[in-house]
């Protein structure tokens, strides 16, 4: 990690910048060697897709699916146009937030050659490419929100409150205030990609706000937070060297392990209670328990390679089974549904 890098200053090259007119031993202009190699449009598109960290999109898609399922079971409404528009809007905000994270982690000297995200470190993309792509995605999200306003019965002030609340959370996680760097990132993600996203998908469909979608979002929010916590625990040493503070750094390795297990297994306790007292269909998420134990063993052995990606996969499967369980539950068996 480039510990000598000045915070807020982007240092792309490892050595000194070649001066105008400098040549190598073969007589070639050194400035030409600093340029990125020409790549095909397919390679360029693949680079943009990888920069979005698509493996993390389960944190966006499952809340949208859950909110839509709650709307269907409680009010009997499900407009496919609103479902697609909501999914694209949330994915756009999530992807843009990932790009903001990439940009600011690099500019603060946090990302390095051994980091999981080396989009800027390896010059896969240039900083200005990441910025422009992020602006495009935020704009796309706003366009989708405008379309949702035209199609949904939800009041403008309610739609704007939820949507721009989520957008602000995705940006301020590392941009602006930078909640991630002051141990508040976990709280932001827990709210944004849990209750807020579920409420957004639900309200867009039914045209009103309610409290019960926030309650149903709790198991999914805990699972999503497990993804972030595994990522922060893996990066604990590099984050500490960069001078930032995350929850994983504050509580240390032992309590981080305890917290990860709590986030991992508490949803299963909730599903067991619901399956026992409400509907057996809510036992479907329990099919993913073996995967959860596998992740626990990997965390305990401190083998953090690909742990966030594997936790995100569990988050996706658990969320889908949860949604199917709600849809399959008999009418009146679940509270408010």
From Swiss-Prot:
Sequence positions bearing N-acetylalanine: 2
Gene Ontology annotations for the cellular component aspect, listed alphabetically: endoplasmic reticulum; endoplasmic reticulum membrane; Golgi membrane; mitochondrial membrane; nucleus
Coiled coil: none
InterPro entries hit by this protein: UbiA_prenyltransferase (IPR000537), UbiA_sf (IPR044878), UBIAD1 (IPR026046)
Catalytic activity, as annotated: menadiol + (2E,6E,10E)-geranylgeranyl diphosphate = menaquinol-4 + diphosphate; all-trans-decaprenyl diphosphate + 4-hydroxybenzoate = 4-hydroxy-3-(all-trans-decaprenyl)benzoate + diphosphate
Keywords: Acetylation, Endoplasmic reticulum, Golgi apparatus, Membrane, Menaquinone biosynthesis, Mitochondrion, Prenyltransferase, Transferase, Transmembrane, Transmembrane helix, Ubiquinone biosynthesis
Keyword Methyltransferase: no
Entry membrane topology: Multi-pass membrane protein
Gene Ontology terms for molecular function: antioxidant activity; prenyltransferase activity
A Pfam family per the record: UbiA
Pathway entry: Quinol/quinone metabolism; menaquinone biosynthesis; Cofactor biosynthesis; ubiquinone biosynthesis
Top EC class of this enzyme: transferase
Listed Gene3D superfamilies: UbiA prenyltransferase
Gene Ontology terms: biological process: circulatory system development; endothelial cell development; menaquinone biosynthetic process; phylloquinone metabolic process; ubiquinone biosynthetic process; vitamin K biosynthetic process
Matches recorded under CDD domains: PT_UbiA_UBIAD1
Main location: endoplasmic reticulum
Enzyme Commission identifier(s): 2.5.1.-, 2.5.1.39
Cellular compartment(s): Endoplasmic reticulum membrane; Golgi apparatus membrane; Mitochondrion membrane
Residues spanning the membrane: 82-102, 133-153, 159-179, 187-207, 208-228, 244-266, 276-296, 314-334
Job of this protein: Prenyltransferase that mediates the formation of menaquinone-4 (MK-4) and coenzyme Q10. MK-4 is a vitamin K2 isoform required for endothelial cell development. Mediates the conversion of phylloquinone (PK) into MK-4, probably by cleaving the side chain of phylloquinone (PK) to release 2-methyl-1,4-naphthoquinone (menadione; K3) and then prenylating it with geranylgeranyl pyrophosphate (GGPP) to form MK-4.
Record family assignment: Belongs to the UbiA prenyltransferase family.
Quaternary structure annotation from Swiss-Prot or TrEMBL: Interacts with HMGCR and SOAT1.
PANTHER family according to UniProt: 1,4-DIHYDROXY-2-NAPHTHOATE OCTAPRENYLTRANSFERASE (PTHR13929), UBIA PRENYLTRANSFERASE DOMAIN-CONTAINING PROTEIN 1 (PTHR13929:SF0)
Name of the protein described by the UniProt record: UbiA prenyltransferase domain-containing protein 1
Organism of origin: Ailuropoda melanoleuca (Giant panda)
């Amino acid at each position: 990690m480039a510990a000598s890098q000045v915070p807020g200053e982007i240092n792309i090259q490892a050595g000194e910048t070649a001066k105008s007119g400098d040549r190598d031993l073969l007589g070639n202009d050194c400035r030409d060697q600093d340029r990125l190699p020409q790549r095909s449009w397919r390679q360029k598109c693949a680079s943009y897709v990888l920069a979005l960290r698509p493996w993390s999109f389960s944190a966006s898609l499952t809340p949208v699916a859950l909110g839509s399922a709650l709307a269907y079971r409680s009010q009997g409404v499900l407009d496919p146009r609103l479902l697609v528009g909501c999914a694209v809007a949330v994915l756009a905000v999530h992807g843009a937030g990932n790009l903001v994270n990439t940009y600011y982690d690099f500019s603060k000297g946090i990302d390095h050659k051994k980091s999981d995200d080396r989009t800027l470190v390896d010059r896969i993309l240039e900083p200005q490419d990441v910025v422009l792509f992020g602006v495009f995605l935020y704009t796309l999200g706003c366009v989708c929100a405008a379309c949702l306003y035209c199609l949904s019965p939800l009041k403008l002030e309610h739609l704007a409150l939820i949507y721009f609340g989520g957008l602000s959370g995705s940006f301020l996680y590392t941009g602006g205030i930078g909640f991630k760097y002051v141990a508040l990132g976990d709280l932001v993600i827990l709210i944004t990609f849990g209750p807020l996203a579920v409420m957004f998908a639900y309200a867009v469909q039914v045209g009103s706000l309610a409290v019960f979608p926030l309650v149903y979002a709790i198991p999914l929010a805990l699972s999503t937070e497990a993804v972030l916590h595994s990522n922060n625990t893996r990066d604990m040493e590099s984050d500490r060297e960069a001078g930032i503070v995350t929850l994983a750094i504050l509580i240390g390795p032992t309590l981080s392990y305890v917290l990860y297990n709590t986030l991992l297994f508490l949803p299963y306790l909730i599903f067991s209670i619901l399956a026992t007292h409400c509907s057996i269909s809510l036992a479907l998420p329990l099919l993913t328990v073996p995967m959860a134990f596998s992740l626990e063993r990997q965390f305990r052995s401190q083998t953090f390679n690909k742990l966030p990606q594997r936790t995100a996969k569990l988050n996706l499967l658990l969320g889908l089974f949860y949604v199917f369980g709600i849809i399959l539950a008999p009418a009146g068996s679940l509270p408010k549904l």
